[in-house]
Amino acid sequence: FISTIYIGGGTPSAIKPELIKKILDKIYDVAGIEIEKNNGTSNGGKKVIGNEMPDKKEKIEITIEVNPGTTTKNNLQMYKNCGINRLSIGLQSTDDDILKKIGRIHNYEQFLDTYKWAEEAGFENINVDLMLGLPGQDIGILKNSLENVVNLKPEPKHISVYSLIVEENTKIEQRINSGELSLPDDEEERRQYHYMKNFLELNGYKHYEISNFAKLGFESKHNMNCWEQKQYVGFGVAAHSYVNGVRYANTTCLLYTSPSQRDRQKYS
């Protein structure tokens, strides 16, 4: 049976929510999943009612990643109505200057709007993404971001904190190479990591995985499935799968209409 569905990116919130619904409806139909909608109706599936897995007092976790710069109140309500019950919001920092430096299309105020709309739409399980090692970010700026996030009302149930990875041939790489931007050195990033870890643990978040912290009972099932080497199937460009002990990666080329059938890389 399916225990989790994760709609990641890229930026899923950049496409029309009707397309997200179409994808989910196809999964529900093929897997026989019945999702109870906010209005009390269902999609006519067979196996799962109210997002609950058969024969288990446990709900299917259905997550979507959203960018505050491409998210509307209406979109969030549509996500909720089609069965999504977990939201991951890509904030990265509450410092607007830092957000500009890394090319984010949103500011902190837009994040606050997104968070408020998510609560109004009925989302209780919300993750907030932050980042370490950002250009111009020191422990003082990181501390301010952490304080702002843990003091949100209601508090986020999950916080992820990742290190910045500079990809080749990107604008940020060009700006770093030209000397326009500079990154914290490894020692500074380590200090930021340990400061962040201690801060979140003191604020009641369990450090259950390298970059992830959760309130009790809100650990990401998707993350845990990956760490526990459970099987998962990825669909779409650059999606990864893990089946029968073998990891697969779909092509990153957008020219192929069937990326799962072309240039798939296999990892033993």
Predicted feature locations:
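Residue-identity detector for glycine
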Residues: 32, 40, 44-45, 50
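C-terminal scaffold of the Radical SAM
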Residues: 1-39, 56-258, 262, 268
